[in-house]
A protein has these predicted regions:
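Early extracytoplasmic/domain-onset interaction patches
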Residues: 20-58
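Acidic/His/Gly-enriched intrinsically disordered linker/tail segments
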Residues: 305-312, 317-400
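Bacterial Sec-dependent N-terminal signal peptides
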Residues: 1-23
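Carboxylate/His-rich catalytic cores and anion/metal-binding grooves
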Residues: 170-181, 232, 246-249, 253, ...
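Non-catalytic architectural context of zinc metalloproteases
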Residues: 42, 67-74, 78-231, 238-245, ...
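Juxtacatalytic substrate-recognition/specificity segment
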Residues: 197-323
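Short glycine/serine- and small hydrophobic-enriched flexible loop segments
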Residues: 332-339, 405-413
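Active-site-proximal structural scaffolding
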Residues: 34, 68, 141, 224, ...
Length: 413
């Protein structure tokens, strides 16, 4: 009887946990031309006591600190009856409410005008969303499921491209927990979408998608997708198979524009690739380098992952001694895959190898510091922002180059 009671108690708690109500996000764009979005989150079943909510200071795939809270304003909180709650800002990006009734609704305005893999950008043409740069979250409730609705899509003629799981309507998506939500970038725009099916070595089929927001017509995007598909096949040859992507698909979120930053950012089942070019046409070789690097990350970093990056902490920079492997080996294989796929000539590939060798052998930083030490410097150099001068010319060698140098040496051996 005691064993049966214990079993029933565990089952009850398990079912209760699995039936937790999701945290609901809504994002709207009534003032997109001025780079603003309005965000609401509804938090049901709030535990008794004070509730903290905050913006992130770190983002998956980035290793330095980023002050995402600086672009948040007009923060308000309400209880389940719609009555305002007293709001305390206890840190620059952390807020607290008390005396709630078990439900808390939070609303705020956010500004974003920078297209890359880390930040948020909004205008009449699109909303380019990195989740940690956009959405507040509840530290106490990181395991709750999440739903999100993207409003105003019809007004702007936008579609949704993301690795999030589709929900009950075209503008609604879900995530099983906070980490997957934060690791799922979103492109809202009138983009071209090209999809194809990949048959894995175990005969299972998965969908690979290319979302392209740029000035090219669909034929150009379609032709480019064939090159991307060739790269994907060559990448598969390195490991013998592709990863088993969650929800059966992988998405390249590609965004070109004259004001964009050049960037690539890996995620578990997608990647963001941005550049300040206005078109794919004529720039295919340069773009394929980023595509190859980022897709290789779907194994290396996303599934072959440094223990030092788990669990990922969104509240501060995440330091790792293994980025020479995570990023450096990816750098090496990204270029090797392009050579094997026929996108680089022997001369072009040898130029890449020469750059790797010179980047380490002639670097004062590499002469004084190990690859592990350079990896730990990422918390300062990986798109981190500072205004004072530094001595990086004499003390730093990129862990990308350092790791690629080691990978080359092992391959030659």
């Amino acid at each position: 009887m005691r064993v049966l009671f214990l079993f029933c108690s565990i089952l009850f708690l398990s079912l209760r946990s699995s039936a937790q109500k999701p945290i609901e996000y809504n994002i709207s764009f009534p003032n997109a031309k001025h780079h603003e979005a309005e965000i609401e989150l509804l938090v049901p079943d709030v535990p008794a006591g004070a509730l903290n909510f905050r913006m992130s200071r770190s983002s998956p795939g980035r290793y330095a600190t980023h002050e995402f809270g600086k672009n948040v304003y007009g923060v308000k909180a309400f209880n389940g009856q719609g009555k305002p709650l007293e709001l305390n800002q206890i840190e620059g990006d952390v807020y607290q409410v008390e005396n709630h009734d078990g439900t808390v609704k939070i609303s705020y305005t956010i500004f974003g005008n920078w297209v890359d893999g880390t930040y948020l950008s909004i205008d009449d043409s699109h909303a380019h969303i990195n989740m940690p740069a956009t959405f507040m979250w509840i530290p106490q409730l990181q395991n709750r499921p999440i739903t999100i609705r993207f409003n105003n899509l019809d007004i702007y003629g936008w579609k949704v491209a993301t690795q999030l799981k589709p929900g009950s309507s075209p503008d609604t998506f879900t995530a099983p927990d906070l980490y997957y939500f934060m690791d799922s970038p979103v492109e809202l725009s009138a983009h071209h979408l090209i999809s194809w099916t990949d048959r894995n070595t175990d005969k299972t089929e998965q969908i690979i998608r290319l979302s392209a927001h740029n000035s090219d017509n669909k034929d150009i995007v379609s032709n480019f997708s064939k090159k991307v598909a060739r790269m994907v096949q060559e990448s598969k040859m390195v490991f013998g198979e592709l990863p088993r992507f969650d929800y059966g698909s992988y998405t390249f979120l590609h965004d070109l524009g004259a004001g964009n930053a050049g960037d690539g950012m890996e995620h578990r089942n997608s990647t963001v690739i941005t550049d300040n070019l206005i078109a794919i046409a004529g720039n295919e070789p340069d773009l394929l380098g980023t595509f190859s690097h980022e897709f290789f990350h779907s194994w290396n970093v996303e599934r072959i992952r440094p223990k030092s990056l788990e669990p990922f902490d969104f509240s501060h920079a995440n330091m790792s001694s293994e980025l020479w492997f995570a990023e450096g080996f990816t750098q090496y294989y990204g270029n090797l895959i392009l050579r094997r796929a026929g996108f680089l000539s022997d001369k072009e590939y040898l130029g890449v190898i020469s750059g790797i060798l010179n980047g380490v052998l002639n670097s004062p930083g590499a002469a004084s510091f190990s690859a592990r030490e350079m990896s730990r410097r990422a918390v300062f150099v990986d798109a981190g922002v500072s205004v004072d001068r530094n001595n990086y010319a004499n003390t730093f060698t990129s862990y990308y180059t350092y790791g690629a140098f080691i990978a080359l040496g092992l391959d030659l051996r």
